[in-house]
Amino acid sequence: MTNTAATTEAKMATEPPKIVWNEGKRRFETEDHEAFIEYKMRNNGKVMDLVHTYVPSFKRGLGLASHLCVAAFEHASSHSISIIPSCSYVSDTFLPRNPSWKPLIHSEVFKSSI
């Protein structure tokens, strides 16, 4: 394990990562800009389509993708925005593990998954 990876793991164990909203790049990202979840706004800004989640290999397994999703879902919730989970991590991993966020899923997506 490299020193960078060891430092990252130690920091993650003691405190949650700081996730910031980068509106210009249309993504939520870690403070170091290395991990992120990208989105596209649809329906005149009423729907956030989460299209891609990226975590560098040396930071995988630390829960960063989940923290990024929570930041996006919290943002959507506080702004009355619904979500389309186009990213496979969001739809196949995050939502099954965190079903309390499912009410934010855009109704047309929910209907098509029944």
Swiss-Prot record:
Q: Where is the active site?
A: 87
Keyword annotations from UniProtKB, A to Z: Acetylation, Acyltransferase, Peroxisome, Transferase
For the keyword Plastid, the answer is no
Query: For CoA, which residues are the binding ones?
Result: 52-55, 61-66, 88-89, 93, 97
The record, for SUPFAM superfamilies, names: Acyl-CoA N-acyltransferases (Nat) (SSF55729)
Q: Which GO terms describe its molecular function?
A: histone acetyltransferase activity
Instruction: Tell me which residues make up the N-acetyltransferase domain.
Output: 18-106
Assigned GO CC terms: peroxisome
Entries under Pfam families matching the protein: Acetyltransf_CG (PF14542)
Protein localization: Peroxisome
Q: Indicate the segments annotated as coiled coil, or none if absent.
A: none
Q: Which residues carry this modification: N-acetylthreonine?
A: 2
Give the Enzyme Commission number.
2.3.1.-
Instruction: Please give the function described in this protein's UniProt entry.
Output: Possesses in vitro histone acetyltransferase activity with histones H3 and H4.
UniProt-recorded name of the protein: Acetyltransferase At1g77540
